[in-house]
């Protein structure tokens, strides 16, 4: 691969969903359309939402206002990858009135999933406003999250948390 990322036993897919703010409808529709499709192979989903501030990179062990449990092994794998890279990542949850990430819909549908966020839940002025634009993204926050994600994939590829 161009970036030197080589996985021998792992296929990576990308799911782009919409309508998280409208009851997780995009993720729920995807889950319904692909129900049972991945039952024969170890599969996990990492759902990213508002990766902005590197000081708030967090693996959410609970989602949907704290009412839905994320997969502990998937959450732990992301945390272990961050620790190995010495990238600060906190164990957290999407709190009451904090909403949800698509991870909640994936978990409710039976997928092994966790949500990763990078925002202050005291909500900044860019969150869900007209200031929530591509040029308000934080390169350092995205780079750290990307590095941890690659490390987690490499660990999974070698048999971790399957």
Where do the model's predicted regions map?
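Acidic/histidine-rich catalytic neighborhood of metal-dependent amide-processing enzymes
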Residues: 1-70
């Amino acid at each position: 691969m161009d970036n030197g990322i080589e996985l021998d036993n792992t296929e990576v897919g990308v799911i782009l969903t919409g309508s998280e703010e409208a009851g997780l409808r995009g993720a729920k529709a995807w889950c319904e359309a692909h129900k049972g499709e991945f039952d024969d192979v170890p599969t996990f989903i990492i759902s990213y939402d508002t990766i902005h501030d590197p000081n708030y990179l967090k693996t959410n062990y609970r989602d949907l206002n704290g009412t839905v449990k994320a997969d502990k092994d998937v959450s732990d794998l992301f945390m272990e990858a961050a620790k190995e890279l010495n990238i600060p990542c906190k164990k957290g949850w999407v709190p009451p009135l904090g909403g949800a990430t698509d991870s909640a819909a994936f978990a409710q549908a039976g997928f092994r999933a966790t949500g990763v966020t990078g925002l202050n839940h005291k909500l900044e002025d860019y969150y869900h406003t007209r200031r929530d634009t591509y040029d308000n993204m934080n390169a350092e926050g995205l780079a750290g999250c990307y590095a941890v994600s690659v490390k987690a994939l490499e660990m999974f590829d070698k048999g971790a948390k399957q």
